Amino acid sequence: MLEGWFVSAMPDLNHRNPFMARYLIQNSLWWIETLGLGGIRQDTYPYNDPVFMAEWAQAIQTQYPKFTIVGEEWSYNPLRVGYWQQSAPNADGYESHLPSVFDFPLQKALVDALTNKESWDKGLVEWYTALSNDFYYENPKALVFMGDNHDMDRLYTQLSENTNLHHMALALLAMAPRTPQLYYGTEILMQNTAKPHDHGLIRTDFPGGWHGDKINAFTKSGLTSEQKATQTLFAKLFQLRSRSEAMRFGETLHYAPNDGVYVISRFAENEKLVLFLNKNEEDRQIDLSDYKELQGYDQYYD
């Protein structure tokens, strides 16, 4: 949709009016400079005029080359998502100048992979297939990957409040060759199961620091054992990612799931990491000879 209202309460601005277009560009530059912003999340990207959006993004990138802009193309089709990323080889020649786009296809694959029963085309293979589409994207590592956000059910709710699956999701969020976005409360199993799709509940205050709060997630006071364990795992995973060149910038090698087990490796010049993900209820013994490419590891963690 290029003309009309996105919803009745949000009238479109006329981006084809040169005075309006110039004002919006100048206004964006002013706010970036005044507040020292590091990035913009641009909502509902395809609903804007594409020619103007390219001019807007280019103007910002020219003035602030290290500035980040993430566009929201809420589609589960990677072809539509990839179209909007800068330098994409689009058939119509369109150049967006947009550095990053939200990876909704991989978000859906994450949930489907963990909640669907394993079969030849369902379960972990859905994640494997989605990640294998990276050849299409111009810069897949710049895509923003999330388990949930402020507009969809909490990740813990999407996973039917299964803590084991939630922990697997956190591991994939940390390990994926993407730029992760983490919604507050994911680390303490915040959920909206009582009212699915209710934005008020999805956006509930983070517990702790507010008058009358009985739970303080900053100090762990009042958290359940499962919440504490999840918070600890969350911290370990993303502290590791913050130190790891391989997890942030390295190459990726992964294997088709086998018997409910998925293996993914991230590696850089002097570092290798591998994740074995077991979706089964029971332990599985891994035959490392099946993964001959993954040699040279000297530390293992459960």
Where are the predicted features?
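Alpha-helical scaffold elements lining the catalytic groove of polysaccharide deacetylases
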Residues: 15-27
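Active-site-proximal helices and loops of the catalytic beta/alpha 8
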Residues: 27-29, 33-138, 143, 161-163, ...
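Substrate-binding cleft of secreted/luminal carbohydrate-active enzymes
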Residues: 170-191
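Asparagine-centered strand-capping/turn motif at beta-strand->loop junctions
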Residues: 276-280
